[in-house]
Amino acid sequence: MLKVLISAGEASGEMYGAALLDALRKLSPDPVEAFGLGGEKMRAAGCDIIVDSKDVAVVGIAEVVAHLPRIYGEFHKLLREADRRKPDVAVLIDFPDFHFRLAKALHARGIPVVYYVSPQLWAWRRGRIKLVQRYVKKMLVIFPFEEQFYREHNVEAEFTGHPLGELSVTVDPRTEFAVRYGLDPAKPWVGILPGSRRKEVQMILPTLIDAAKKLGPANEYLLPVASTLDAGWMQAQLLAIPQPPRVTLTSDARQTLVQSRAAMVASGTATVEASVLGTPFVMVYRVAPLSWRVGRRLVKLDRFAMPNLIAGREVVRELVQENFTADKVAAEVSALIEDGPRRAQVLKNLAEVREHLQSGRTNESAAERAARSVLSVAQRKD
């Protein structure tokens, strides 16, 4: 029996964790018992969820401080289960502030730690590399440049490929999708993706809805509900906004993106998904002012959107903090809806990003390559 602790605190990490668990079961010569932190996708993949990701998913320094007692309690709940089950290996997926503390605690218990999906140490708070050096057995990274970064810092690292580089979606017939959600197939459809955490949505959604108001009723607006949230809560957020336009909640972000003519997307994994699926979008983001002031002192980047970082230049427009206004979002989305030079340029740019993400692919999936590394670490005696 191979016992694995898997921890993913966000929707994107949970998606990678579920795929990794499937790959582990496929490749492991022994039965796999998995437990940890996650949500419905990981539960469906057979992981015994000890801590639900909804209970620890907060964003920004000010927000984290407000929820520290609850997060502390869930942290120790997970550790108690690790003490009871004694896993052969732990896989921590992104979510660095929580996971670096967890890595330290697991290391002290003699449990080897594999970190899957690197925090952006190359962008900010590089001092955290010391935590990786001390407590992480191996880094599994999803961007090629990250492998070199870690090796330069004497950390064992492997580029497994980006799971989303393999992303393909069977596109539902437009008429079928329209009937399912009561949409007008003659109108352009615009995706609204405000993030996967409650505080994030509360900071971002009102401005996106204001942008939709400015764009007007000539479009249909689709809002997929992340697995870390629920439709009732999201509907309540919409109802709290004065005179919102008609917004349709959907259950599948990828299908929503591939069906959308253009999209407004919060910074994060959804920007990579939109790039791979070829949906033109504008990236937006906002955090609490305190979080922003502290973050700007630490971040070493001029760009924030992952597609822009991958390409090394602006491929999509990014509107962050005070630059994130309804007028600017509406203007960019309007240009992306129209068959004009802006839409054509962004589509060309996104094709280049897809090439970067798909480079170095083999016959194995990214999850399978990651699973082989996890199995190797679990079997090592060093």
Curated annotation (Swiss-Prot):
It catalyses: a lipid X + a UDP-2-N,3-O-bis[(3R)-3-hydroxyacyl]-alpha-D-glucosamine = a lipid A disaccharide + UDP + H(+). One of its GO terms (biological process) is lipid A biosynthetic process. It holds the Pfam family LpxB. Its EC number is 2.4.1.182. Pathway: Bacterial outer membrane biogenesis; LPS lipid A biosynthesis. InterPro entries: Glyco_trans_19 (IPR003835). Keywords: Glycosyltransferase, Lipid A biosynthesis, Lipid biosynthesis, Lipid metabolism, Transferase. Coiled coil: none annotated. One of its GO terms (molecular function) is phospholipid binding. It is an enzyme of class 2 (transferase). One of its GO terms (cellular component) is membrane. The keyword Transmembrane helix does not apply. Condensation of UDP-2,3-diacylglucosamine and 2,3-diacylglucosamine-1-phosphate to form lipid A disaccharide, a precursor of lipid A, a phosphorylated glycolipid that anchors the lipopolysaccharide to the outer membrane of the cell. Belongs to the LpxB family. This is Lipid-A-disaccharide synthase. The gene is lpxB.
